[in-house]
Amino acid sequence: MMAALYPSTDLSGASSSSLPSSPSSSSPNEVMALKDVREVKEENTLNEKLFLLACDKGDYYMVKKILEENSSGDLNINCVDVLGRNAVTITIENENLDILQLLLDYGCQSADALLVAIDSEVVGAVDILLNHRPKRSSRPTIVKLMERIQNPEYSTTMDVAPVILAAHRNNYEILTMLLKQDVSLPKPHAVGCECTLCSAKNKKDSLRHSRFRLDIYRCLASPALIMLTEEDPILRAFELSADLKELSLVEVEFRNDYEELARQCKMFAKDLLAQARNSRELEVILNHTSSDEPLDKRGLLEERMNLSRLKLAIKYNQKEFVSQSNCQQFLNTVWFGQMSGYRRKPTCKKIMTVLTVGIFWPVLSLCYLIAPKSQFGRIIHTPFMKFIIHGASYFTFLLLLNLYSLVYNEDKKNTMGPALERIDYLLILWIIGMIWSDIKRLWYEGLEDFLEESRNQLSFVMNSLYLATFALKVVAHNKFHDFADRKDWDAFHPTLVAEGLFAFANVLSYLRLFFMYTTSSILGPLQISMGQMLQDFGKFLGMFLLVLFSFTIGLTQLYDKGYTSKEQKDCVGIFCEQQSNDTFHSFIGTCFALFWYIFSLAHVAIFVTRFSYGEELQSFVGAVIVGTYNVVVVIVLTKLLVAMLHKSFQLIANHEDKEWKFARAKLWLSYFDDKCTLPPPFNIIPSPKTICYMISSLSKWICSHTSKGKVKRQNSLKEWRNLKQKRDENYQKVMCCLVHRYLTSMRQKMQSTDQATVENLNELRQDLSKFRNEIRDLLGFRTSKYAMFYPRN
């Protein structure tokens, strides 16, 4: 068989005559017959092959000559090659636009022509296809063709709509052309939507339904499409990234794709903000309020800086946007305010400034309380000064906690209901002030946003414990007036419970200082890493508790045989110097033993000690269980925990600058508004500013019911609408500038990274071929049609 295919030589280069003629030398087991099992298309004629070859080589005059000679219609101008490409597709891939126009004029058709042009990003071909007017009215227009392609039942080589494909390629020019054709895009339904349409699509083909949703979101996440179709591209990028993050948690099969699209939206918002060139543009962008957000009318009339867009970025967890250099520089300017010279001072002067403000913070608070609108009051109102004053107030609270333990009266140790001391009342004032501050934040931020901050959660728990502590002290003082030794008290006596809650609240009070580390570039990343590690430890507990519960059940059933000691013991199990199996007589005791065994605080003997010399099997089973527990928990799970914590720390370390700047921005924003200017306990004193606001609001409400008041209110609303409209117009102007700069920078980046690729070489080859054919035509040379198959060497 091989000799018949290659009569001169075989595969090894030997002559065919040298092959043995014995039939046994060509056994059927030594060869494998190959056969094309795919659908065999009708082979093209010689003219059709010539036609496709001329289109491939870019020979305009040869293509035109073949089409002109096809008056009888013998040539099928829609023929395809072995790859399934027709003349239009080949011409688009080679970027021969003049031949493409010629083919369209002669009626060549291709359902995939527009998709091929978009996929190849040949802008000229897309323009020709969209603007081409066919001679025959029976042919479908481009709009109808796009509608056919968008139909799920229509099958093409690339099963995707043109606008979706253009968005996937992120080609701004092609998308501009397509959007002029009044195209539409199906709106993706929410994940888990149970409407009739989604249920039918999911039931018919769940894979196609999921892939279609992914293609739609790839289109919506295209920066080019966002810039073209959205008036507020930054807000749209925020919303899309949040939706894509939610989809990645539901559509776990396509998690990587959705997470990559979410990162793309975040980077687009960041790159768009990076195009701002001055502080005025940054102020317009970061203070813009969308129509869906609540508006601060008083702040708008007073031209107050609300940083609504920045707060929205933090809400959507846009770390790239917030940590962008322009945004951080603007935040620094707002943070220091009228104390901008503080950053340029020497370190010693910085320390002296902080210590001076920290020592005299009560005097400064009283000055602001009396004259908040004075020059001195405006300086105190700056976020940096508020941070120092609030910090000094909190350190004073911690100092009172230390004094509380130092001045504890030993004479009242056995008093079941001791009275409150002066220092107790001071602590209560501070606690009421901190609670009032949390209530104001809860009122303005809402419950959901308030609980998202771990700092607010810790503050809520801490204040609740302090409230419960002093409430129990009051109850104990009113109910108990006797003296008795503490060992004779009830285990849940109000005084004992109050002392326990107070001790735990003190621990949380000092741990709250961790959040002040966020302002430091050295301690801040460590504090963020610790928070991430605690989250990972919570995930680890889900696995550890299951293992602990499993071994606890086994050991309790093994040793809980109702054995009780006749002697009264002061200790049980691992708490005794001589540990024995009596610790496993209860579920809690077994949990204690297994838990402390991890830290080598429980001896292995308690797992294998026998109640009698005949219970060797029980001892052996106990040894096997503790050995298995030692392997699973002590060796495997603890090492897994170490690996998880190391991974969390490394993840934060790799993005240390971004994570720290984002956390610092969240802390700074809590001091930017004027809701909590004074620290505890001065914030519980009604200030003149608050009284003036209340009187002003009451007078406006009364005047609004009069004729003059209604006119004044309408004028105020009209002024407010004009200011809002003016701000929106300024925002659109700035956004147009940012979009234009973004496109320019992307074009320059593509040009700077443009190198000699296969496409560039192919384009050069086509240009040389066109030039050669034009020279031949000008000189009068005519190439034979069949000479194209056999060119001269």
UniProtKB/Swiss-Prot annotation:
Subcellular location: Cell membrane
UniProt topological domain (Cytoplasmic) ranges: 1-345, 380-386, 440-455, 518-536, 645-793
Top-level division of the source organism's lineage: Eukaryota
GO biological process, one term: regulation of cardiac conduction
Region (Disordered): 1-30
Consequence of changing residue 647 to N: Decreases permeability to calcium ions
Consequence the record notes for mutating residue 646 to N: Decreases permeability to calcium ions and increases permeability to cesium ions
Transmembrane segments: 387-404, 423-439, 456-475, 497-517, 537-558, 624-644
Binding site for Zn(2+): 189, 193, 195, 198
Protein's name according to its UniProt entry: Short transient receptor potential channel 1
Gene coding for it: TRPC1
